[in-house]
């Protein structure tokens, strides 16, 4: 029997379940079903959910839409973890209820940092000079 190599990445099933969990959490937060003052005043985007291969653990990446009070939003999400886990378990039929872990999504910050670097005049000059050297 062949063993799955580590480099293959998540299976289609793991990706599908992660997307279902993301959709359910987004719906709960959009409706305001969580009775929390911080979450009521800060719209939150669930950007990605990464499931473990056994589907028992989910890492949920969240980002406040206005980009403010990220730590307060994360604390509120973590405070309401039990409620959110229960709701996900009720709405998605799985053998085990996934344990949710909330983390801040820094991908937007990293993308804007890279964009700023690429727009830097020194970098633009180097990129333009590199293109001319490749043509000869």
From Swiss-Prot:
**Mind listing the GO molecular function terms for this protein?**
ribosomal small subunit binding
The entry assigns this protein to a family as follows: Belongs to the RbfA family.
What's this protein's name?
A: Ribosome-binding factor A
The alphabetical list of record keywords is: Cytoplasm, Ribosome biogenesis
Name the domain of life this protein comes from. Answer: Bacteria
| Annotated gene | rbfA
The UniProt entry lists the main location of this chain as cytoplasm
Q: A Pfam family name for this chain?
A: RBFA
Source organism: Sphingopyxis alaskensis (strain DSM 13593 / LMG 18877 / RB2256)
A GO BP term here is: maturation of SSU-rRNA
Q: Name one GO cellular component term.
A: cytosol
- Complexes and interactors: Monomer. Binds 30S ribosomal subunits, but not 50S ribosomal subunits or 70S ribosomes.
Where's it found, cell-wise?
Cytoplasm
Instruction: List where the protein spans the membrane.
Output: none
What's this protein's function? One of several proteins that assist in the late maturation steps of the functional core of the 30S ribosomal subunit. Associates with free 30S ribosomal subunits (but not with 30S subunits that are part of 70S ribosomes or polysomes). Required for efficient processing of 16S rRNA. May interact with the 5'-terminal helix region of 16S rRNA.
């Amino acid at each position: 029997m062949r063993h799955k190599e580590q480099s293959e990445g998540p299976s289609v099933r793991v990706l599908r379940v992660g997307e279902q969990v993301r959709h359910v959490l987004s719906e709960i937060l959009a409706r305001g079903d969580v009775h929390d003052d911080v979450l009521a005043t800060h719209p939150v985007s669930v950007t990605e959910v990464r499931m473990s291969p056994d589907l028992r653990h989910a890492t949920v990446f969240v980002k406040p839409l206005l980009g403010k009070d990220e730590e307060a939003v994360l604390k509120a999400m973590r405070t309401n973890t039990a409620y959110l886990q229960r709701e996900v378990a009720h709405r998605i039929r799985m053998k085990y209820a996934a344990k949710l872990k909330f983390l801040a999504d820094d991908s937007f910050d990293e993308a804007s940092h890279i964009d700023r670097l690429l727009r830097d005049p020194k970098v633009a000059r180097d990129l333009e000079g590199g293109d001319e050297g490749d043509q000869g």
